């Protein structure tokens, strides 16, 4: 297994992955901003919230590298060429919707933090970006694809939950909706294209029934991981689940708060529901 990821096989139809909770900052990162500022990009502690899942037979994949080093939830075409010392030799994304995040500094390799602080005071070589793709992006995506394929082969369907956390209020350079106050959860299926809407509705109803506020496809619809590995017509369902960080941690200090235990219990009940759900019967 690649040292940049942690992957645990499962026996059930359910696959969970956490692409943004990594905290291993490679010496070759050579960032210029403060570490505390950079760490605001993390989905800190998400892997701890779901640490019960592998014991239930759920496949688990997590990135150990930090999101700001390489964002595994982006395509390798989402290149910010303003960061590079030479033209990118591969294809570069041209879709204006996708490129809106690159313009905010949030491409495959981040240029700026959510508050707009520059991450580098240097240009990156094409070779070092290629090395990050080879050592981080490729093994992460291979592990997610393998886990989903294995779940689908065993059961005839797969449910993939792409696990994230979000700040209570959107920062100025984080989304196209700066200053927006987030719900407790945002459930995203890219407008019904990555999962059965009945399955998505079941998740939304379950969380709302537990007393949480739940938004749907706004402001987060899901990005590359749910897009790439979903095919509802073939019973491959992928859903992005965003959790408001104030439910379980102090956003300033990154320390776990007293709400962690109750939130984890809610997530355990959600996982139990999904393990009992066959989307083909919905």
Where do the language-model regions lie?
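N-terminal catalytic or cofactor-binding beta/alpha core of small enzyme domains
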Residues: 1-160, 165-282
């Amino acid at each position: 297994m690649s040292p940049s990821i942690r992957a645990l096989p499962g026996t059930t139809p359910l696959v969970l992955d956490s692409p943004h909770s990594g905290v291993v900052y490679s010496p070759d990162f050579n960032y210029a901003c403060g570490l505390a500022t950079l760490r605001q990009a993390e989905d800190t502690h998400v892997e701890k919230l779901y640490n019960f899942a592998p014991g239930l037979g759920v496949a688990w994949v997590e990135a150990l590298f930090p999101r700001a080093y390489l964002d595994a939830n982006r395509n390798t075409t989402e290149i910010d060429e303003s960061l590079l010392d030479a033209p990118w030799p591969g294809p570069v994304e041209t879709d204006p919707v996708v490129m809106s995040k690159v313009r905010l500094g949030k491409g495959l390799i981040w240029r700026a933090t959510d508050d707009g602080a520059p991450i580098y005071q240097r240009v990156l070589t094409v070779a070092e970006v290629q090395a990050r793709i080879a050592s981080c992006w490729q093994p992460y995506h291979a592990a997610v694809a393998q886990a989903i394929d294995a779940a689908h082969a065993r059961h005839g369907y797969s449910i993939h939950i792409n696990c994230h956390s979000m700040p209570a209020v959107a920062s100025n350079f984080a989304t196209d909706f700066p200053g927006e106050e987030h719900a407790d959860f945002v459930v995203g299926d890219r407008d019904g294209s990555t999962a059965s809407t009945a399955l998505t509705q079941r998740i939304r109803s379950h969380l709302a029934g537990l007393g949480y506020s739940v938004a749907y496809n706004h402001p987060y619809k899901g990005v590359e991981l749910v897009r790439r590995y979903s095919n509802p017509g073939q019973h491959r369902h992928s859903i992005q689940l965003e959790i408001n960080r104030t439910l379980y941690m102090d956003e300033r200090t990154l320390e776990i708060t007293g709400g962690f235990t109750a939130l984890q219990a809610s997530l355990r009940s959600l996982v139990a529901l999904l393990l009992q759900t066959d989307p083909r019967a919905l």
